[in-house]
Amino acid sequence: MIIVLAILAGIIGIAGSILPGLPGTPVSWIGLLLLYIWGPEDMALKTLIIWGVVVAIVSVVDYIVPMYFTKLTGGSKYAERGAIVGLIAGIILTPVGMILGSFLGAFLFELYYTRQGAAQALKAAIGSFLGFITGTGLKTIVAVLILWKIFVFAF
């Protein structure tokens, strides 16, 4: 039963790395924690701590990277907020909708609120989008690696 819960936590962690509003990598790490406490194979505390630190770092980086990319391209906080609003609205339209929604949200918010023109809004939207993709990619990679570790320690 613990193995099933650990694997389920790993899968939910991957989904949460992609979908906004769901915790991602921390849930994956909980799967490792379950196996550390009750798993069939001995896992070193060092392994659990290292993955915990990786999860903490990726969680912080996920908040910093979109802001960095947006500012790098001259965007404002409105582009960041628009990307989040567009992403959430795009969930209804599948993963493609999430990506397009994030981009369009950043573009429209930047265009409307800063009134600096379409060229600047486009640059900000590209920066916000690249930041979102980078953060999501990092979280997803870590969540997949943790799920792999869960399988290694479970079987």
Where are these regions (language model features)?
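Short, amphipathic, aromatic/basic-enriched membrane-interface segments that mark the entry/exit
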Residues: 1, 15-22, 66-77, 113-119
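Short hydrophobic alpha-helical membrane-embedded segments
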Residues: 1-8, 26-27, 73-84, 120-125
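Helix-coil boundary and interhelical linker segments in multi-pass alpha-helical membrane proteins
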Residues: 1-4, 37-50, 152-155
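Transmembrane alpha-helix interface/packing and boundary motifs in multi-pass membrane proteins
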Residues: 10-27, 86-97
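Interfacial segments of multi-pass membrane proteins
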Residues: 27-43, 85-93, 104-113
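Helix-adjacent hinge/juxtasegments
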Residues: 46, 50-90
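C-terminal binding/interaction regions
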Residues: 113-155
